[in-house]
A protein has these predicted regions:
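A Rossmann-like FAD-binding core segment of flavoenzymes
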Residues: 25-27, 75-94, 101, 168-263
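N-terminal glycine-rich dinucleotide-binding loop that anchors FAD/FMN and/or NAD(P) in oxidoreductases
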Residues: 43-75, 188-211, 339, 543-555, ...
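Glycine-rich dinucleotide-binding loop and its adjacent helix/turn
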Residues: 108-169, 204, 263-265, 479-483, ...
């Protein structure tokens, strides 16, 4: 048997190696138009950033070793330019000559190619793709030639990895994405965690825009569709890929609607003796039951193996691609499997969803990290998709769910999966078990969930967190009754009104909803709590890179140390406040906490007026020094009063009548002293300016909800 394989990377190399193991006597020719075969193209961004220091590490196996190990006739820089299915021949172009090879079986593993930039003003010395080793070499040379600014067009897998690694090289990086989110393989709210991570490292993000042309008048600029011009020393185009289908189309093979090669479960094409595998083929999506294209290395390698089995006479089938994926963005990992909520809506498939934010391991064991999980399932319990983002354990949970999906398990059945447990690795109830338990409660009617984007109109928002947490910020209009006080304060709630209970992550909100339901209230839990609400309302804010806080100085022998690494919310905030309250002004405490506590720490320090004297993000926790604010010093009225004719600004954030009056009195006094005074009314302070009765104004759902939560004008302010 003579087999020709066209394409020598993932699917092609896998097929050649498998075929040789099955048939020692087969004649196998591997044609590759580039200079390299069997290389780690998924590792290219990490060599760009220096994470993989040695270029040769990317070469999984060179042509000579592949020949020695597998006795395969490897022909690099040899391009298949034509196929004759009737004569079973392939025409090859190599070294300025053409020749023809016959075959008994043929495998097309031609892969995919980045969508090329044919935009006006494209300069090949400044606009690059990033797909092959030669592409990578060009970008590394450009980045190392004194370049300071880079622009990455495309916010998918490759775009995110390239942006991150260019930043590691010290370049100023702008990431432009045509979608309103990063990584469309996730839903927008789940991708928001990755966007914020990139912003934290200094990457500038422009979403909902695309590059439409380039200008070069001595300064190279990318022109966006809104007319803005972004200066860059070079641009990397990562705006998607297309299948390399030219050979297949010319040979008369059947193609799908997007140009991918159509294959059956044995990876046979429409022409006898021709198989296809990898990025160029159309595959079954088992969840939707429809054909699609999912260009991932894992499926490509498996398809190459299965195609080889069938060419060798074995009976192997490929049962579709669920699309299990994972990506690293700085300290976070994101993983997903199945369909997204957006895809389910497009397909008009009914679904239910769950958000939860558990820890990666037992809360009492140091080094854990928060996971953001989303599960999508059908009304009958069939798992439709899942997404996970976090510093630890995202891949593990999605792997478990992907396996459950392949085995036909339902969402409630995730609750009974027996998964390995020890405190350094997990909690006794794995986060996947939690998802199953929540799904089971929903299926049995024990838990009604509401969602940030579809809050019932007129619902009361009940924040059941502790007062110290509430002070850090909440959903506008929410009322705070801590969970521990709820049973004793039921009289403050209205049974005629829908209640949406929430906490930070969802657990206490669920407990509150169970209490209230059994006391006759119409109550639901806000799925995912305030963390999911924040993710739903995320908008990237590009600011000048802020230098990281200085590293904490070595602690003095008699200094305080507060270790809250093993405390779940609200423990860290409550313990820190208690510690600070017991300290004298100017005294410092060395704080050890989980890395996920960083945003809450920054908010608490700002709202409390204390000082973050230093902070360092370590591998598995953060270390910070918090200094208690100094006591106010006495001063005379004349010393504290503003100078005449100076400007002053005040922010009114409250809807308390006494605070509003105080702000107005102070402003009038300062104006009488000759100062120019501005008052900014924001959030609840907007109540002072509201007209009553209010004029008819067309508003969005969120705006209407916000309006219902505010007092109806200055006369409705409470003390």
């Amino acid at each position: 048997m003579k087999v020709i394989i066209i394409g020598g990377v993932a699917a092609g190399a896998s097929a050649a190696a498998r075929l040789r193991r099955l048939d020692e006597n087969a004649e196998i020719i591997l044609l590759e138009r580039e200079s390299y075969i069997s290389y780690a193209n998924c590792g290219l961004p990490y060599h760009l950033g220096g994470v993989i220091p040695e270029r040769k590490s990317l070469m999984v196996m060179g042509p000579s070793r592949f020949k020695a190990w597998f006795n395969v006739d490897v022909r690099t820089e040899s391009e298949a330019v034509a196929i004759d299915p009737e004569a079973r021949t392939v025409t090859v172009a190599a070294n300025d000559r053409r020749y023809t090879e016959t075959y008994d079986q043929l495998l097309l593993a031609t892969g995919s190619t980045p969508v090329a930039s044919d935009l006006p003003g494209t300069d090949p010395d400044k606009v690059f793709c990033f797909w092959t080793i030669p592409d990578m070499d060009k970008v590394i040379a450009k980045a190392g030639s004194g370049a300071r600014k880079a622009l990455v067009a495309g916010a998918g897998f490759v775009g995110l990895e390239v942006a991150e690694n260019l930043r590691h090289r010290g370049l100023e990086v702008t990431l432009v994405g045509s979608s309103k989110q990063v990584l469309p393989a996730l839903d927008a709210e789940m991708g928001s965690y990755l966007a914020q991570e990139l912003l934290n490292t200094g990457v500038r993000i422009e979403l909902g825009h695309k590059v439409v042309s380039f200008e070069n008048d001595g300064s190279f600029r990318a022109v966006l569709n809104d007319g803005r011009k972004l200066e860059a020393d070079f641009v990397i185009m990562c705006a998607g890929v297309k299948p390399n289908n030219e050979l297949a189309a010319a040979a008369g093979l059947k193609l799908g609607p997007r140009g991918h090669i159509t294959v059956d479960e044995k990876l046979r094409t429409s022409q006898p003796g021709i198989f296809a595998a990898g990025d160029a083929v159309e595959v079954l999506q088992p969840v939707s039951g429809r054909q699609t294209a999912i260009p991932l290395a894992g499926p490509a390698n498996k398809q190459g193996r299965i195609a080889a089995d069938n060419m060798a006479g074995l009976d192997s089938e490929y049962h579709g691609t669920l699309g299990a994926m994972v990506i690293k963005v700085e300290k976070l990992s994101a993983a997903a499997v199945g369909l997204t909520e957006r895809q389910l809506q497009q397909l008009q498939m009914p679904y239910r969803k769950i958000y939860t934010h558990p820890g990666s391991n037992a809360s009492y064991y140091p080094g854990g990290a928060m996971l953001h999980l989303k599960l999508l399932f059908a009304p009958d319990g069939k798992i439709l998709g899942a997404q996970a983002v976090g510093a630890k354990g995202a891949d593990k949970r999605i792997d478990v769910i992907a396996t459950a999906m392949r085995c036909g398990k339902t969402a409630p059945e995730l609750a009974v999966l027996e998964l390995a447990y020890a405190p350094p690795f997990n909690s006794a109830k794995d986060p996947v078990n939690f998802l199953g338990m929540i799904a089971e409660n929903m299926q049995k009617g024990l838990c009604e969930s509401v969602y940030s984007e579809t809050l019932p109109e007129g619902a009361m928002l009940l924040d059941v967190r502790e007062p110290e947490e509430f002070e850090l910020g909440t959903i506008p209009g929410a009322v705070n009754i801590p969970l521990g006080q709820l049973r004793g304060r039921l009289g403050e709630l209205d049974k005629s009104r829908k209640i949406a209970a929430f906490c930070r992550v969802g657990l206490r909100g669920y407990l509150a909803s169970r209490i209230l339901k059994q006391h006759g209230f119409d109550c639901a839990n806000l799925s995912g709590g305030i963390l999911t609400w924040e993710a739903m309302n995320f908008k990237p804010r590009n600011t000048a890179p802020v230098p990281p806080p200085k590293k904490p100085e070595p602690a003095a022998a008699n200094s305080r140390t507060l270790d809250v690494r093993t405390l779940a919310c609200p423990g860290p905030v409550v313990r820190l406040k208690k510690e600070i309250d017991a300290m004298t002004p100017g005294e410092e405490v060395r704080l050890l906490a989980a890395t996920s506590f960083a945003p809450d720490l920054a908010n608490w320090v700002q709202s409390s007026g204390n000082e973050l004297a230093g902070m360092e993000m370590k591998e598995e926790h953060l270390e910070a020094v918090v200094r208690k604010k100094s006591a106010p010093t006495a001063c005379s009225l004349s010393a504290s009063a503003p100078a005449p004719n100076s400007d002053a600004a005040m922010v009114l954030f409250s809807n308390d009548l006494d605070k509003a009056l105080a702000a107005l009195i102070i402003a009038c006094g300062m104006a009488a002293a000759g100062s120019k005074v501005s008052i900014f009314f924001t959030f609840w302070g907007l109540s002072v300016l509201r007209k009553n009765p209010a004029p008819a104004v067309k508003k969005t759902l969120i705006s209407r909800m916000f309006g219902m939560m505010l007092p109806a004008g200055a006369r409705k302010l409470a003390l």
